[in-house]
A protein has these predicted regions:
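C-terminal subregions of glycosyltransferases and related glycan-biosynthesis enzymes
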Residues: 189-190, 196-284
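A conserved acidic beta->alpha catalytic loop
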Residues: 22, 29, 37-47, 103, ...
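Conserved donor NDP-sugar-binding/catalytic core segment of glycosyltransferases
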Residues: 107, 111-141
Length: 284
């Protein structure tokens, strides 16, 4: 099977409906659909129970009903310990060569998204398209990196769009599953490890895949999530972007602009190396 689409949900019935209906509306059905619900109490579980045996309403269908009997569908509703625990559950039961994480509230832009993207799933480890986002009342297309030739320095910027990223399932076997000790940055850590430090390949395709609803934990603006984001950024800096790894970063970025600039100015390179040694000693 070429593709598995994984949706996680917790108490977001309205968002879940949008996501599910956008998936069931696809003209191409060469995928399995996995929904992981965290034992919701807002009616999500009952809604998921209903679509196991019934039709689901869909505005794009002329008779306002969409048959779901031909879909390979898995639904799990049970308590979990967080976003990345739920995502990992979905990954472990998936069978597709590629995985798309389309969480509740995010939805595919039209009924031909999967038909258009399937030919692009060519063996590249991670294939990323665009999302449509709305922030501060403005709607725009987010192209992430907007290029295929990314390097370690690019990876540090964290422009990954999981709603538009098709990852080979074998990457999780090779580099590990999402780190469940993170509440916000677990997917960022995964991409750093397989693209920044590992040898995974990446391709950008200029196709818009999904609407990103926003308002998730990574966008959280209350005091708790602001503090959590700061803590995880500090942890990332220490564990993934430590100055001790700077020489390795440069090695991974040999084709990047920073490497070229430093080597054109030998004094800048010498200063950078000296500062690296000093900071390494301070950190010990």
């Amino acid at each position: 099977m070429k593709l598995s689409i994984i949706t996680i949900n917790y108490n977001n019935l309205s968002g879940l409906r949008k996501t599910v209906e956008s998936v069931f509306a696809q003209t191409c059905r060469d995928f399995e659909y996995i929904i992981i619900d965290g034992a919701s109490t807002d009616g999500s579980k009952e809604y998921l129970d209903s679509i196991k045996v019934n039709n689901v309403a869909d505005k794009a269908n002329t008779d306002n009903k969409l048959q779901i009997t031909n879909y390979k569908l898995q639904i799990i509703s049970e308590p979990d310990t967080g976003i990345y625990n739920a995502m990992n559950k979905g990954i472990r039961v998936s069978h597709g060569d590629y995985l798309l994480m389309l969480n509740s509230g995010d939805y595919l832009v039209d009924s031909n998204v999967i038909a258009r993207i399937i030919p692009e799933l060519d063996g590249t480890d991670i294939i990323q398209g665009n999302t449509i986002c709305t922030r501060n009342g403005k709607t725009f297309v987010n192209r992430g990196y907007g290029k295929s030739d990314i390097n370690y320095i690019d990876v540090q910027k964290g422009y990954f769009l999981h709603q538009a990223s098709f990852c080979k399932r074998t990457l999780f076997e090779q580099y590990g599953y999402f780190d469940e000790s993170y509440k916000i940055a677990g997917d960022t850590v995964f991409y750093i490890r397989c693209l920044g430090k590992g040898n995974a390949t990446f391709k950008y395709v200029n196709q818009t895949i999904a609407y990103y609803e926003g308002g998730g934990v990574s966008d959280g603006k209350n005091a708790y999530w602001i503090k959590q984001r700061a803590l995880e950024q500090k942890r990332l800096s220490k564990e993934e972007f430590s100055i001790r790894q700077w020489n390795t970063c440069i090695e991974y970025d040999k084709k990047g602009r920073l490497y070229d600039k430093l080597h054109r100015h030998k004094w800048a390179w010498s200063i950078m190396m000296l500062m690296s040694k000093i900071i390494n000693r301070m950190e010990k």
